[in-house]
């Protein structure tokens, strides 16, 4: 599953990053802020840690797995904080260009303001759920190993929406509605669920806990999506 998740991230972000880098070189968009690079390095490090931890368990090096896993207690908070800093940074980049940029930039970016305000919903949702699910996983690491290993993957699946939404060749409901992103995230975890179900002949508690939190949160995002009150709330949150 770790390899599968890394593949999703690469397929989503590499072409998008190459396109935007070319735009920066052509002067068609602002340079990437340093905060974006920091977040990318932290997320990449987390995914590689997840892969390494999976390989350690698969090769019966559990004592090393436990020692290396301590890194998550540093990496996860750093990743969450970086995300909380990055979201308003990218928001202000678009909002500032739409309101104070050159006329051509204002014309191009103004239609993106409502979109970026809606995307802020997804970013907040992903950040909160990732932190909650990782917290559940780490709390269960000693007493409930089955919950721990599954919840680590289920937590990691939540921010995959950022990569999936960049796969413009996929059928999508965006930007009108976020429901397609949720469907693709469910599909991303489905191989693990099916394998688990076939092997153990039951639905593990980790999936029940995850769905009990994930689905209401997704419904709340869908409810707030593109509502006038949400747009005004987003602008107040961002201080504009």
Task: List where the protein language model places each region.
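Alpha-helical membrane insertion/targeting regions
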Residues: 1-240
């Amino acid at each position: 599953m770790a390899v599968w998740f890394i593949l999703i991230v690469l397929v989503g972000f590499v072409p998008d990053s190459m396109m935007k880098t070319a735009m920066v070189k052509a002067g068609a968009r602002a340079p990437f802020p340093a905060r974006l690079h920091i977040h990318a390095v932290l997320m990449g490090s987390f995914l590689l840690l997840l892969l390494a931890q999976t390989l350690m368990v698969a090769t019966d090096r559990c004592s090393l797995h436990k020692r290396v896993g301590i890194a998550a207690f540093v990496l996860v908070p750093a990743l969450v904080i970086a995300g909380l800093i990055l979201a308003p940074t990218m928001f202000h980049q678009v909002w500032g260009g739409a309101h104070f940029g050159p006329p051509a930039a204002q014309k191009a970016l103004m239609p993106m303001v409502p979109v970026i305000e809606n995307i802020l919903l997804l970013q907040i949702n992903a950040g909160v759920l990732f932190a909650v699910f990782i917290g559940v996983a780490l709390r269960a690491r000693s007493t409930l190993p089955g919950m721990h290993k599954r919840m680590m993957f289920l937590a990691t699946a939540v921010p995959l929406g950022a990569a999936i939404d960049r796969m413009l060749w996929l059928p999508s409901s965006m930007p009108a509605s976020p429901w397609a992103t949720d469907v693709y995230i469910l599909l991303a975890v489905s191989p693990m669920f099916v394998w688990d179900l076939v092997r153990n002949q039951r639905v593990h508690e980790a999936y029940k806990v995850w769905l009990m939190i994930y689905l209401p949160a997704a419904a709340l995002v869908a409810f707030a999506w593109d509502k006038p009150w949400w747009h005004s709330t987003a602008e107040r949150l961002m201080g504009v």
